[in-house]
Amino acid sequence: MATIEVEQVTPVAAENIEVPPPKAVESEEVTTVSESLPAPVTESQAPVEVTTKDLVVEETEKPIEETEEAQVETPEVVEIKKDEEAPVETPVVVEDESKTEEVVEAKKEEEVEEKKTEEAPVVVEEEKKPEAEEEKPAVEASVTAPVEKADE
């Protein structure tokens, strides 16, 4: 086995540890951070088109009306589709599942029948083998018996 040498380290007293003073944030760093943030847009800086109340109201009202009409029509169409499609799809899925189960069951039945047919000849062969073995000792016994008589 390999041996490991462990070196013990004694902790240094807390008085000897030098802690650097906290870093003072320079004004340059503060300005770069504030410049990287997006500045809020004031009314004096905003484009003229946005500040005009008439144009903004007309533009916002038209899209709202169009979206409201579209929203009203869309749910009705979706609801009708859901009602029509859901009952139609569900029986189809159930039928598919039952068909696959029937097919699987039919295959299992075929496999069982095949196993039965495979097992039957094996059993018959096993029965034949003992008969053949029984015949051989009888023949050997008849052969050995005359030999013994000849020796006497």
Swiss-Prot record:
The segments carrying the sequence repeats are 57-62, 67-71, 78-82, 104-108, 112-116, 124-129, 131-136
Record's keyword terms, sorted = Abscisic acid signaling pathway, Calcium, Cytoplasm, Repeat
Q: Where is the composition biased (Basic and acidic residues)?
A: 96-138
Region: 7 X 5 AA approximate repeats of V-E-E-K-K, residue numbers: 57-136
Keyword Metal-binding among record annotations: no
Q: What induces it?
A: Levels follow a circadian cycle with higher levels during the night and lower levels in light phases. Accumulates in darkness within 24 hours, but repressed by light and the product of photosynthesis (e.g. sucrose) (at protein level). Induced by sucrose depletion, but activated by mannitol and sorbitol. Triggered by gibberellic acid (GA) and salt stresses (e.g. NaCl and KCl). Suppressed by a high concentration of calcium Ca(2+) and of other metal ions.
Protein role: Binds calcium Ca(2+) and may act as a signal mediator to buffer Ca(2+).
The protein's name is Cytosolic calcium-binding protein 1
Q: Please give the organism.
A: Arabidopsis thaliana
- Gene responsible for this protein: CCaP1
